[in-house]
UniProtKB/Swiss-Prot annotation:
This is Ribonuclease P protein component 4. Zn(2+) binds at residues 57, 60, 83, 86. It is found in: Cytoplasm. Signal peptide: none annotated. Binds 1 zinc ion per subunit. Keywords: Cytoplasm, Endonuclease, Hydrolase, Metal-binding, Nuclease, tRNA processing, Zinc. GO terms for biological process: tRNA 5'-leader removal. GO terms for molecular function: ribonuclease P activity; zinc ion binding. It comes from Saccharolobus islandicus (strain M.14.25 / Kamchatka #1) (Sulfolobus islandicus).
Length: 104
């Protein structure tokens, strides 16, 4: 179990490093970091946490930075995220907060 925790920690470090590198402008190096993180995930059979999985394009492995490599649109309670490099789209249903309708 200890090895899987080390692998997961390294995956998170690589994805965060890729995000920082992409912000500085080196998209190719950022893609390599994410590909390496994906490889670690597959070889070690460790799931990438959802927060980090949504930080990159699953088709071209580019870190998704709003306004730089990603476009976000909201249409009728659906968030559409589009990668500006490969035009890959992902849709997420926007839901209300679970406690927002409760009367106090």
């Amino acid at each position: 179990m200890r090895i899987k925790n080390k692998i997961k920690k390294r995956i998170i470090e690589l994805i965060e490093l890729a995000y920082i590198t992409a912000r500085k402008g080196d998209l190719e190096l950022a893609r390599e970091y994410i590909k390496l993180a994906e490889m670690y995930s597959r070889k070690g059979r460790v799931k990438i946490p959802l927060k980090y999985k949504r930080m990159f394009c699953r088709k071209c492995y580019t870190p998704l930075i709003t306004g730089v490599t990603e476009r976000r649109r909201i249409r009728s309670k659906i968030l559409i995220r589009t990668c500006l490099i490969c035009n890959w789209q992902r849709r997420y249903v926007l839901s209300r907060n679970k406690g927002s309708n409760k009367e106090n």
